[in-house]
Amino acid sequence: MKSIKRIGLCISLLILSIFVTSCDGDNKITGDSKETQIKKSFSKTLDMYPIKNLEDLYDKEGYRDGEFKKGDKGMWTIYTDFAKGNKSDELDDEGMVLNLDRNTRTAKGYYFVKKFYEKDKLPDRKNYKVEMKNNKIILLDKVEDPNLKKRIENFKFFGQYANFKDLENYNNGDVSINWNVPSYDVEYKMSNKDENVKQLRSRYNIPTEKAPMLKMHIDGDLKGSSVGYKRLEIDFSKEGRDISVIDYLSYKPAKK
């Protein structure tokens, strides 16, 4: 049930969690070829991490295809959320999405707070508008809760402190492909000694010592596409309790 709720959030942000199956069931493959291709596809954005100053994205161009209109410099969208289930089978989820328009060199988005319930109760959701100037998040809406206000104004995206320079050293991952979409997934067991894991533990309340899984998902052409997307998840979930961080960086047309 909680997985369905988690998918619901991703759908609202066009980040669709796809259960990777083929017509006959799971289509698992082995071998390094596809695994290497998936990592190389991810490295096009992960090699940019850490992006300490998000305004650097104004001067970076991503993959362009026929979806871009002439003269459109494109828009980067960066997203991070942290979701944690509790003993009441509820799921609390907080995060931020920011759109950086390279044409206008402006960045606008929102911070969201969501709670999903196990029973037939609609989720609670609140969005708080933000913008970014001089690499600083500026809260545009009034927030009464001082702790929430502080979390919003001090928010850092995973891509601002993550480092995947050693991505090529991740090997023997569990690879899955759905040729019908197409979509590609690979999972790796991480170590608690990993600097990215240490960073997340220092920033979020993660009530488990369980080493997480690194899950990389690509929807669309491995070579690149402004229609598809890539999603990275670090999953600390344990004994049916959802605990995970989702990261997303995409480059798409800014002009419709």
UniProtKB/Swiss-Prot annotation:
Cysteines engaged in disulfide bonds, as pairs: none
UniProt cross-references to Pfam families, sorted A to Z: DUF576
Residues with lipidation of kind S-diacylglycerol cysteine: C23
Lipid bilayer topology: Lipid-anchor
Residues making up the signal peptide according to the UniProt record: 1-22
Top-level lineage group: Bacteria
Gene3D superfamilies on file: 2.50.20.40
InterPro entries, per database record: Csa, Csa_sf
UniProt name for this protein: Uncharacterized lipoprotein SAUSA300_0414
